[in-house]
Each structure stands twice: as structure tokens, then as C-alpha cells.
Amino acid sequence: MLMLFVFGVLLHEVSLSGQNEAPPNTHSIPGEPLYNYASIRLPEEHIPFFLHNNRHIATVCRKDSLCPYKKHLEKLKYCWGYEKSCKPEFRFGYPVCSYVDMGWTDTLESAEDIFWKQADFGYARERLEEMHVLCQPKETSDSSLVCSRYLQYCRATNLYLDLRNIKRNHDRFKEDFFQSGEIGGHCKLDIRTLTSEGQRKSPLQSWFAELQSYTQLNFRPIEDAKCDIVIEKPTYFMKLDAGVNMYHHFCDFINLYITQHVNNSFSTDVYIVMWDTSSYGYGDLFSDTWNAFTDYDVIHLKTYDSKRVCFKEAVFSLLPRMRYGLFYNTPLISGCQNTGLFRAFAQHVLHRLNITQEGPKDGKIRVTILARSTEYRKILNQNELVNALKTVSTFEVQIVDYKYRELGFLDQLRITHNTDIFIGMHGAGLTHLLFLPDWAAVFELYNCEDERCYLDLARLRGVHYITWRRQNKVFPQDKGHHPTLGEHPKFTNYSFDVEEFMYLVLQAADHVLQHPKWPFKKKHDEL
């Protein structure tokens, strides 16, 4: 498989064969299935797409009377979109553009294609098309290194890491962490191409700093017994953004999910190693999310200090702050929304974390207000706004404060996913919009002059977004007082005109009731 994969890269035909999925058991005990279908653990809607890229499993399913996915065998033309043979009409959704951003293009069709490549499964296709071999194996027992452009994603086999002489300090992403001979493999290294990929060298944008010392070794690390530890399981290396901020940390998770697509494996029987060159720990308020990606605790790189460690299969994951990456500071064409990629990500995470939809409720719209107990961006007349909402009998209103010490992240997700209108001030908590149902609306009560952040995230996810528009009807407590920047709209609190607030919420409700996926078709005049 290794040689096929590498030669496939050379031919620009990256194998999509489920490299990490368990092989079918063709000699199973009578009365038992030929494959462990329960290990797939994907939402029902994703199964045809999985089988499209794992035809060996589809073939077994066709022969197996106990396969639960037979109904999907007639849908094997369905594809995510990054596969070379994928026809547009069978893709997992396609973005919609309501107008043409003339700064980018001049037709709706080309606008949709641009957005699909920027932020949908077209983004994964571009990474696959960039793949090239940097270290070529000669035999099946050799090592290999295959990377996308700028070393934003890499895949290595029989990787050797020598951490016996490592010196750690406060720097989480030390650039000269490895010296020559301390990271590498037994393969023919294209050193010129490797060193030419450093244009985006930066801690959370590229793996260049970590792999620039990759060395062509004169020994086979595993075969020649040069390893103190051999890691048999596939391992994902990740450099993580801030684990205390949902917006930044979910840049980690979405890029891990895209990496799984590029790698064509959604197995949770994998290790995840946090690449951190410091001796510090890592504060993670959203650690439950890892259960969607691995069966094991996340491993800190320092766990392997003072040892030579060899990884049979290693993946260097796409990173959270890549230039033109997703979704931190991503320049997006205007007028387009609804990516299949972000919808699939939300479905994937919710399914694996067992977060279910308990509604919607006939005759009710579930409204959730996200309160803030922080010093800034509080809603000063919150009670007044809530009382106004409660005058509408259709609204079922709840106020939540997503404080991790009082409400676990899984409970937060259950509330969010069972919300039809989600209201909150500008802040990382609005990242919850990723997990709203498709028909929902998010109301960023006030964006504090940061106009694109959650508007763009809502566009990516495909949920309706509104925010406050009339400046004469929002009342800041003062001009704001940033500790170093002086006056700043994010560093104060706000009151809002009740009538204008209700007008905007009713607009959001109107969207919910008219959404194609809203199951109740009653007239909304009662609002």
C-alpha cells in the first residue's frame, strides 16, 4: 500500500482506499458479519460517501447478508467532491451565491466554484492535488515522506524521532527543536524540494520548521532495531491553537476533520500527539471533542522525551492558522454560503458525541440567549429583552451562561443543537453556531465593529445570520477601555432598544418558519 500510495502521488492520483480502516474479515464465524460495521461510526447520511471511497468495504457489504448498509449500495456515485471521478451533481452539497462579488468574478457560477474551492470540499481537493513525494522509498520496508505545498499537510511512514538530547523551554513551537539526524527515515530525500517549501514557515501555518531537519538515514529505523519505542497505530501530529477559546480551538478540530478526508480515514483507533516543544501542559476546555476523533487520551510530545521513537504511520495535520486556510482570518468571496464541508463536520462531531435533535417543536420556536459573566460585552438590559421575548407565545426562551465549571461542553452542545434562534454578543461562544440545526438562525446581537468573524462562520456553516444595524438604537456603557489600545468597542457593555430587538428576532423567526427543513408548515402570521 505504501508503494502504491507514493507512486499514486507521483501520478497525481492519490489513493483513496481507506488506508487506516480495518480490513474486512472474510473468514468470520457463521452468523457474524464479515466486517465490523459498527467501527465506521458515521452519520447515516455520510455512509454512501464513505463507501464510494472504500469500495473494498462496499464489496464485502454486498456479499454480507448482515450488512446494515445495503440500501446505500445503490448510491455509490455519491462523493464528497474532492475525488477525481466525482461528478458535480453527486457532490455532498454545493454552496449557494445570492449575488456576484465583482472583486472576485463576474458570474454566479464562477462565484460558487470559487467559494467551493476556498471553503468547501474543493479545499481538500486542492490539498490532494498538491501532494508530492519528498522522500522516496525503494523497498516496502523503507520510510517515506509525502507533503502538500508549503508542508501544510504531510504523511510519513517508518518515521524516526530521536528525543534523547531534547532541550525544552517556554517556547511551544521551537523552530530548531530537531537537529540533523534526529528526525528522518530510510528513503531517498529530495532535499532541494524540501528546502524550497519554507515560504510560509510559521508555528501554526506550516510544518516546515519541524521537518526542515528531516534526514535521509543510512539505517532502517524499525528493521534495524534503532527505536526504543515503536508506535504501531496511525498517529496524527497536531500543533494546537488556544484550548481555552472555542473559536480558535475549533480551528484545530475542523482542520483535523479535513485531514481525515485527505487521508481517507475516519478511524478513532488512532493516536493524537500534541506537538509542543515546551514543558508546559495544555488547558483544554473542549476536551470532550477529542472523542469524535480518537479512542485515546491526547499525548503530549514530551511523553517521549529521552527516547528514540518510531512511528509506522504518521500524519502531520493541517494547521489552525494557515494562510488561506480554514477558518481563522480566511478571505472569502462575498455573497455565498452553505458549505457541505462545515455541515458534514457538524454532523460528524454531533454523531460521535451522541448529541441528538429533540425537536423541533410544533408551534414553538426555541430561543436561547447566551449570557456573559465576563467583565465586558454584557447585555445591560438583558431582563428587559427577555421579558419582551416572553410576550410572544410561540417563543420558548432560555438564558444560558456557558461557564465550563458549571456546564460541561457536551451539555452546552445539547442546548445549542436544540435551539432554533441563538442570540449572543460578539465572542467565542458564538462558535456554537456550528452546531445549530440547519434551519436555525444566529443573532449576533452586536458585532462590536468586528463585522466578518461570525458572519463568515455562519456563511460557512450555512445558518442564517443577522446582527444589529441601527447604531442609534444601541447604547454602549462607555467608549470602552482596552488595557493597551485605549478606547475599544469590545471592552465595554451595551443596552439595546427593545422594539428594534424584537423586530430583528421576529425576522429570525420568520426565516426559521420558512426554512425548507423546518417540518411544520403552519402559517407564521401568529407571530
From Swiss-Prot:
Record field: catalytic activity: L-seryl-[protein] + UDP-N-acetyl-alpha-D-glucosamine = 3-O-(N-acetyl-beta-D-glucosaminyl)-L-seryl-[protein] + UDP + H(+); L-threonyl-[protein] + UDP-N-acetyl-alpha-D-glucosamine = 3-O-(N-acetyl-beta-D-glucosaminyl)-L-threonyl-[protein] + UDP + H(+)
Q: According to the UniProt entry, what is the EC number of this protein?
A: 2.4.1.255
| UniProtKB keywords | Disease variant, Endoplasmic reticulum, Glycoprotein, Glycosyltransferase, Signal, Transferase
Q: Does the keyword Repeat apply?
A: no
Where would you find this protein in the cell?
Answer: Endoplasmic reticulum lumen
Q: Its Gene Ontology molecular function terms?
A: protein O-acetylglucosaminyltransferase activity
GO BP annotation list: protein O-GlcNAcylation via threonine; protein O-linked glycosylation
- UniProt entry tagged with the keyword Cell membrane: no
Q: Where is the signal peptide?
A: 1-17
Glycans attached where?
N354
The entry assigns this protein to a family as follows: Belongs to the glycosyltransferase 61 family.
**Motif Prevents secretion from ER located where?**
524-527
* Function text: Catalyzes the transfer of a single N-acetylglucosamine from UDP-GlcNAc to a serine or threonine residue in extracellular proteins resulting in their modification with a beta-linked N-acetylglucosamine (O-GlcNAc). Specifically glycosylates the Thr residue located between the fifth and sixth conserved cysteines of folded EGF-like domains.
PANTHER family, sorted:
EGF DOMAIN-SPECIFIC O-LINKED N-ACETYLGLUCOSAMINE TRANSFERASE, GLYCOSYLTRANSFERASE
Record-linked InterPro entries:
Glyco_transf_61_cat, Glycosyltransferase_61
Higher taxonomy: Eukaryota, Metazoa, Chordata, Craniata, Vertebrata
UniProt lists the gene as EOGT
Disease link: Adams-Oliver syndrome 4: A form of Adams-Oliver syndrome, a disorder characterized by the congenital absence of skin (aplasia cutis congenita) in combination with transverse limb defects. Aplasia cutis congenita can be located anywhere on the body, but in the vast majority of the cases, it is present on the posterior parietal region where it is often associated with an underlying defect of the parietal bones. Limb abnormalities are typically limb truncation defects affecting the distal phalanges or entire digits (true ectrodactyly).
Give the protein name, as stated in the record: EGF domain-specific O-linked N-acetylglucosamine transferase
GO cellular component labels: endoplasmic reticulum lumen
Source taxon at top rank: Eukaryota
